[in-house]
Design a protein with these regions (language model features):
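Short, extreme N-terminal segment that most often corresponds to the first beta-strand
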Residues: 2-52, 169
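Charged interaction segments
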Residues: 10, 53-55, 60-169
Length: 169
């Protein structure tokens, strides 16, 4: 984990007594505009979750990651600098038809960060970003506006679950 939480980034709220975050939050997913994945063949076990703001998300749950040798949050929990081969292949294949973003976040005990990898035209659209606001940046790339919400993260509802696997139940 790399940096303290910026409370405006749609992450867990601080404990009222200590001011620190006591709840863990982790997310690994691929996001795109609504309908983009409808023509994309999904690997077995993956499914599309409709979010607010015309965004669809494919949560990369634990069983899928283990089956395809994709580590837990390789950029925010590890020192990864490139996408694992199976994940890179999926992003390249799908992005030939539409823009998408791989997003990840990991926070615990008041610290953590986010990462994104943007794809379009079958290739990376920019360098990998690891920062406190990486997911919001990726969502803006996909055309999400925060509207009345605190930020883009909250606007599409990524604050509904605190763990990737919860999106699949």
């Amino acid at each position: 984990m790399r940096s303290p939480i910026d409370r405006s980034s749609g992450q867990p709220s601080p404990d009222s007594m200590s001011g620190t975050v006591t709840v863990a939050y982790s997310l690994q997913a691929i996001v795109a505009r609504s309908g983009a994945f409808s023509s994309a063949p999904l690997p077995q076990g993956l499914h599309v979750v409709r979010l607010r703001g015309d965004i669809d998300m494919i949560p990369l749950h634990t069983a899928f990651r283990k089956a395809h040798d994709i580590p837990f949050c390789p950029f925010t929990d590890g020192d990864g600098t490139v996408l694992p081969p199976a994940l890179l292949s999926l992003c390249q294949q799908w992005s030939a038809q539409f823009a998408l973003a791989y997003i990840e976040a990991e926070f615990f005990g008041g610290s953590g960060c986010q990462a994104h990898a943007l794809f379009s035209d079958g290739r990376a659209a920019s360098p990998l970003v690891v920062s406190d606001h990486a997911i919001n940046e990726a969502l803006r790339y996909l055309g999400v506006a925060k509207g009345e919400a605190r930020d883009e993260f909250e606007a599409i509802g990524l604050d509904q679950h605190r763990d990737t696997d919860r999106w699949t139940t």
